């Protein structure tokens, strides 16, 4: 396989693993928040506000992974170096 095929595969795996980690993190955060609201309904406003802030921070991971994948796919900072090494 050539360099560009590996770039596409790597970007795809990066997005897959980054999205998987984000989904698991968000699921655990929502689960914990719902358990907290079930135990203490009076604190639901505080719990949900804190959960939303936490979810925004977790979601930033997915955004960073997306940005890095797009840079690897389209800007491709390593293209010239790798093509020189391959060309000899």
UniProtKB/Swiss-Prot annotation:
Membrane protein topology class: Multi-pass membrane protein
MF term (GO), any: lipid binding
Positions of the record's site feature: Reversibly protonated during proton transport: 59
Cited CDD domains: ATP-synt_Fo_c
Assigned protein family: Belongs to the ATPase C chain family.
Matching InterPro entries: ATP_synth_csu_bac/chlpt, ATP_synth_F0_csu, ATP_synth_F0_csu_DDCD_BS, ATPase_proteolipid_c-like_dom, F/V-ATP_Csub_sf
Lineage, broadest ranks: Bacteria, Pseudomonadati, Thermodesulfobacteriota, Desulfuromonadia, Desulfuromonadales
The protein's name: ATP synthase subunit c 1
One Pfam short name: ATP-synt_C
């Amino acid at each position: 396989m050539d360099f560009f095929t590996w770039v596409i595969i790597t970007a795809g795996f990066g997005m897959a693993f980054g999205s998987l980690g984000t989904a698991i993190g968000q699921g655990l955060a929502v689960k914990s928040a719902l358990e907290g609201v079930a135990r203490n309904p009076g604190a639901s406003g505080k719990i949900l506000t804190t959960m939303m802030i936490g979810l925004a921070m977790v979601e930033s991971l997915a955004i960073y992974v997306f940005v890095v994948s797009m840079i690897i796919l389209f800007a491709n900072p390593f293209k010239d170096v790798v093509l020189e090494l391959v060309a000899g």
